[in-house]
Amino acid sequence: MTLHQNDAILTPSDETTTVTSMNFLTFEDNYLAGQSPERKIIMTNKEKALALIGTFVSGDTAKAKELLATGYIQHNLAFGTGADAFVAAVEGLAQAPVKTTVNNIRAFEDGDKVFLQTVYNFAGAGEQVGFDVFRFDADGKIAEHWDNLADKAAPNPSGHTQIDGTLEKKDVDKEETRKIVAGFVGDVLRGENPDKLTSYYDGDKYIQHNTAIADGLSGLGAALEAMAKQGISMVYNKTHMVLADGDYALACSEGTFGGVPTTYYDLFRVENGFIAEHWDVMETLADKSTWANENGKF
């Protein structure tokens, strides 16, 4: 693995949530049901994001339209941009012979953004683990979306999957969490100060969910050595976002893997000032000739 120096820019839910046909009451719902408007249920941004991915299961195009800003910006390069394109995707999945399933594992919120870790199976095509980031506008509508997806894989050398592990989120200073993770990504993953590697870990205490790497700093070192022997380099060129909620932070970066343009979404849990646990999704960047929108991955 070659760690490459370059430029940089710099919640979970307590339970796994199976997203089905989520039914949050609007003003009109309450009114028609004979309830007082004052009893209207106000959705949080996290609930709105979960409701939106829930429309893949329910086929509820009206709900999708309600949640999305008209000028919705899509960064998943397999889909067109705009609210209409999203609604068309919901309609298409609803008509598929095999029902889509959506299983949210962790959900976080940071300012105007919500970030989710979810297992999808779109129309029976196979399970994929994904990270989604949604940006909300001033009116509370979902205005922009980024994501990274990878096929669900077998447990790694330490027996961990891409989604298991700690679910509890601690109420700690998210800015301190962001600072630690941003520092690690810059110093270690982008290679700006590689000698600081061990300072980010509490000895060998490190739970790893990457599909090919074992637990501990020792497991990471062994994996990097094996990659180097195979001539495989993993390069992080630029980090676009570091989102934090409690003791968790998600870093969204781009670079190359084995010389191929790749996007990296890395979720870290921080404990006592050290990186304690890591989940990730790597996705090969699609050739521009295949893009369904011109917004770019970031």
Question: How should each PLM-predicted stretch be described?
Answer:
Residues 2-8, 12-298:
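C-terminal and inter-domain tail/linker signature
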